Amino acid sequence: MKLLLFTALVLVVISLIEVEAENERACIPLEKECTKTPGNCCSGLKCDCYRRFEQGVAKGIQCWCIEKDVTYKGV
């Protein structure tokens, strides 16, 4: 019985350590691509996505970490 309780306690501790490690993963810095992980930009940044066109044909969506209060306009 004690072995069973000890094993359960060890498993709980290991799972808590894994969750904490996942929460501390490295964030994506300014102007780096965040298409696959949009919620992982560093503090003060947001993941902003754009649809890319080549000769009028959509070629997919690309996302970049940019500053939260900055707006970009085409030239």
Swiss-Prot record:
Residues 22-25 form a propeptide. Residues 1-21 form the signal peptide. InterPro entries: Spider_toxin_CSTX_knottin. The keyword Glycosyltransferase does not apply. One of its GO terms (molecular function) is toxin activity. GO terms for cellular component: extracellular region. Expressed by the venom gland. Keywords: Disulfide bond, Secreted, Signal, Toxin. It is found in: Secreted. Contains 4 disulfide bonds. It comes from the Eukaryota. Belongs to the neurotoxin 19 (CSTX) family. 06 (U6-Lctx) subfamily. This is U6-lycotoxin-Ls1d. It comes from Lycosa singoriensis (Wolf spider).
